[in-house]
């Protein structure tokens, strides 16, 4: 039986600095919308899934409103903004259209991510260093609207430094290379990628002790524990693997199982 203390969600009124050593769990429900859009019908509901995730102990809900609207739709964003009881984390590209939507909806978090129309999923981190001036202005506009801003980046010193220079509230470290190495059975590469992530957290905290450090992409119950054990990780955002688990055990149990894997 899972310890109840491990599955209680963190609401907006609770300490946003997460003073416990255990990272929070943000659940991405994009692929509930993927299933819906496959038929172009009104079900299943990403909102209903998100509410069940919160009930089961998710500390936040992540959705990615892509420019091509391949899964999450505008209506989903507005619905969730009015009904979630934890934090909404809206992933989006740094475009004028998305800025307008975010400033209307005012999610608790916006996470800026790169987008390519041909990609199946986000393939890498945002090049903050290469577009520092424009992103600094974009981040400041979101923050002026009362929105906290995270930047999805690869675990590289130059990108972390640029994120700090942008005055971002958080970074989310891309764990895709770590996850892919594990799937390929490349143990040595897994260890290398894990060290990169650990060093990135150290660098981030050295440059700005108040910067929150999240992580995500490709995390599963099999590989999440090593990431969750890294000192300084604030939150893990997990979607595809958790929704896949939900097909067999239900979404509430999938959330509980993921938290158990994180904190075992």
UniProtKB/Swiss-Prot annotation:
Keywords attached to this entry: Cytoplasm, Pyridoxine biosynthesis, Transferase
Site feature: Transition state stabilizer: 172
Binding positions (3-amino-2-oxopropyl phosphate): 28, 39, 218, 239-240
GN (gene name): pdxJ
InterPro entries: Aldolase_TIM, PyrdxlP_synth_PdxJ, Pyridoxine-5'_phos_synth
Subcellular location: Cytoplasm
Catalytically driven reaction(s): 3-amino-2-oxopropyl phosphate + 1-deoxy-D-xylulose 5-phosphate = pyridoxine 5'-phosphate + phosphate + 2 H2O + H(+)
Protein's name in the database: Pyridoxine 5'-phosphate synthase
Binding site for 1-deoxy-D-xylulose 5-phosphate: 30-31, 66, 71, 121
Oligomer status and interactors: Homooctamer; tetramer of dimers.
Domain of life: Bacteria
GO molecular function, one term: pyridoxine 5'-phosphate synthase activity
GO biological process, one term: pyridoxine biosynthetic process
Segments passing through the bilayer: none
Biological function: Catalyzes the complicated ring closure reaction between the two acyclic compounds 1-deoxy-D-xylulose-5-phosphate (DXP) and 3-amino-2-oxopropyl phosphate (1-amino-acetone-3-phosphate or AAP) to form pyridoxine 5'-phosphate (PNP) and inorganic phosphate.
Family of this protein: Belongs to the PNP synthase family.
Listed GO CC annotations: cytosol
Residue numbers annotated as active site: 64 (proton acceptor), 91 (proton acceptor), 217 (proton donor)
EC number from the UniProt entry: 2.6.99.2
Listed CDD domains: PNPsynthase
Biased composition (Polar residues): 1-21
Ranges for region Disordered: 1-22
Stored SUPFAM superfamilies: Pyridoxine 5'-phosphate synthase
Functional pathway: Cofactor biosynthesis; pyridoxine 5'-phosphate biosynthesis; pyridoxine 5'-phosphate from D-erythrose 4-phosphate: step 5/5
């Amino acid at each position: 039986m899972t310890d109840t203390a491990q599955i209680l969600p963190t609401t907006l009124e609770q300490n946003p600095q997460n003073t416990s050593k255990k990272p929070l769990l943000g659940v991405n429900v994009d692929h509930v919308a993927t299933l819906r859009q496959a038929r172009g019908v009104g079900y299943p509901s990403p909102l209903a899934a998100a509410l069940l995730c919160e009930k089961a102990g998710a500390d936040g809900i992540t959705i990615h409103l892509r420019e091509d609207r391949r899964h999450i739709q505008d209506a989903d964003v507005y619905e969730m903004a009015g009904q979630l009881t934890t934090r909404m984390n809206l992933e989006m590209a740094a475009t004028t259209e998305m800025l307008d939507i975010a400033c209307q909806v005012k999610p608790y978090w916006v996470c800026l991510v790169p987008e390519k129309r041909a990609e199946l999923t986000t393939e890498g981190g945002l090049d903050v260093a290469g577009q520092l001036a424009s992103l600094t202005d974009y981040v400041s506009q979101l923050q002026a609207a009362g929105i906290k801003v995270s930047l999805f980046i690869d675990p590289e010193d130059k990108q972390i430094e640029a994120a700090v220079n942008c005055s971002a509230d958080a970074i989310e470290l891309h764990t895709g290379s770590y996850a892919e190495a594990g799937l390929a059975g490349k143990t040595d590469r897994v260890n290398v990628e894990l060290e990169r992530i650990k060093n990135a957290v150290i660098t981030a905290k050295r440059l700005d002790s108040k910067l929150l450090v999240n992580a995500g992409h490709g995390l599963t119950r099999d590989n999440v524990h090593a990431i969750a054990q890294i000192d300084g990780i604030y939150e893990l955002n997990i979607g595809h693997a958790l929704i896949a688990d939900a097909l067999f055990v239900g979404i509430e149990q999938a959330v509980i199982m993921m938290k158990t894997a994180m904190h075992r």
